[in-house]
């Protein structure tokens, strides 16, 4: 994994390239680039084995729109510079898919696997308390979400602690997204980033930009290798497999898998969660080293693990026509340039993995409305469909089966609505980027995505007199 300094340098370099291409005045460019504030938080917690002091960060990159939005990462490797780079990326990611948030990110230096659930809850609640003290979490100012090392459980603790500290805030549960459904979370948030990758690829394959690659056929006919089978990688693999694509390779830290005819991703995920002992894996012929799978031929490579996994030292090993960035910053800036020169098209992270914040936006809106999606329309839709079916039966003289009637009458579920909204946001964002790319002949889709988002920030800053 690349160092934190390499990560922030890479994000900054990619931003600088876009700014230079756009020709933005230096002072305004520095305003857009600068991280507005980074808060270092140290706090002690009394655990089962004594008092321990933890260090966390919350960076706010841009408040051109509020609240600011970005996840909280639990990792022993997290640092202030990493959090700042991710906050910067969040600003542009939010702008690309047109959600009304500025960019923020948080991190806690901790290995969560080393602590009991009871201790982890204490740590999370204390961290939340420190964030609340500093105005770094609230429905109107700063709204965290899950990231590496965190999930629904941690978000539930954060939401509950915020509500305990702010008992009169009717919108308290909107202080964080990615919560369990019974606390105001939405069905589909866990899969959102991975499914968003599928929608990003589908949008690309449905565009004329496909002609810019050496890829033949539609998305269903592609062979795909995915680096990282965590939440992002698994749900991307699942959506792509269900669409008809073939997942031929999975790269994990300690063990990788390859089968040119396709892998059983559910089997692999279960094995990774339950055993991870090579001798226990049932299909021994599918076990390979990381380097062997990394360099295997494929149509699409999806790095979905962590930042800096593709560098100037290993980019030449890749044998792919297209890269879709599932992780934040998986390519260093030099690797990005080398691969572009090599003719490999890259769908960048600030667009490709924006599905998570898109669905977080839906959850935040739902929490403010205090009403589940579809509540006002469900019965009306059922009556409309029933009337339509009756007209069809009368006009054709044919009876429609009960199964078909039930399917049409039940209407869309919450996850149907969430997926529909996510697909619309990802499709519209790609169409807008593609139009700009083809009109201006920018050097890459990444540069185009940055320029597209930077233009929105420029407009926001000009509106407030900067």
Predicted regions and their residues:
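Conserved active-site and cofactor/substrate-binding residues in soluble primary-metabolism enzymes
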Residues: 6, 10-13, 36, 78-81, ...
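Adenosine-phosphate binding glycine-rich loop
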Residues: 2-6, 204-205, 321-466
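Glycine/serine-rich phosphate-binding loop and adjoining beta1-alpha1 elements at the start
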Residues: 75, 94-220
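Glycine-rich, N-terminal phosphate-binding loop and its surrounding beta-alpha-beta segment
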Residues: 40-114
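Short, Gly/Pro- and small/polar-rich lid/capping loops
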Residues: 2-42
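Glycine-rich phosphate/diphosphate-binding loop of Rossmann-like nucleotide-binding domains
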Residues: 184-295
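Rossmann-like adenosine-cofactor binding region
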Residues: 255-346
